[in-house]
């Protein structure tokens, strides 16, 4: 039974979200109760906002009202310090075509070709939102999460998606590294999925959203 719709057609994002929410919400079977927008023909919502939060809410609202289901959405991206926050909300289409990870990585690495390690600071950002349709009470919530890191000079690893192969999390490196430095010098595409999902920007945003989602499901 569909209880929650993820306002996205990105299968990588759906897999990641299911793992983030697994066993965190009473009465929710993430494998059967959480589906993506494409599986129930929900609309593909243009990202016309100018912030992650605006885009996230646009998608959640549209899907909630069109399907009558509780909808969750996120807008995520990479913010590079030396590029003054770019690619930001344009991360998924940085190279011109939405969702072309290889082209986006190639373009960004080219733009940073001459930037030394000490100036390659960046962070993953995520605004996660919940929209409950009018028939079920009609309310919204937005939460935010970040993962700071350093950008590598070349992709590393086959896991994850998006900019994961070039992002090395700060928290897994240095003198105070989590997990005793076992994952130092690894990109988000190399570290185990369960480790990534414990520190990622998306995990932090959606975990903050969990109480609102639990409340919505209890009153459904």
What spans do the regions from the language model cover?
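Anionic-ligand binding patches
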Residues: 2-5, 11-28, 32-33, 37-220
């Amino acid at each position: 039974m569909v209880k929650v719709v993820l306002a996205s057609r990105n299968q990588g994002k759906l897999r990641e979200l299911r793992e983030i929410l697994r066993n965190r919400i009473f009465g929710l079977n993430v494998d059967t109760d959480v589906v993506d927008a494409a599986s129930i023909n929900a609309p593909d919502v243009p990202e016309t906002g100018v912030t992650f939060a605006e885009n996230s809410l646009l998608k959640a609202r549209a899907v909630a009202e069109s399907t009558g289901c509780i909808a969750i959405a996120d807008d995520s991206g990479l913010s590079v310090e030396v590029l003054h926050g770019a690619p930001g909300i344009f991360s998924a289409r940085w190279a011109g075509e939405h969702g072309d990870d290889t082209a986006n990585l190639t373009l960004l690495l080219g733009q940073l070709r001459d930037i030394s390690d000490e100036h390659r600071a960046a962070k993953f950002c995520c605004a996660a939102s919940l929209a409950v349709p009018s028939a079920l009470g009609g309310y919204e919530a937005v939460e935010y999460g970040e993962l700071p890191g350093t950008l590598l000079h070349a992709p590393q690893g086959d896991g994850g998606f998006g900019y994961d192969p070039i992002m090395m999390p700060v928290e897994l490196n240095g003198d105070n590294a989590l997990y005793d430095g076992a994952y130092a010098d690894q990109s988000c595409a190399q570290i185990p999925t369960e480790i990534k999902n414990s520190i990622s920007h998306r995990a932090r945003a959606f975990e903050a959203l969990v109480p609102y989602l639990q409340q919505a499901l209890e009153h459904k």
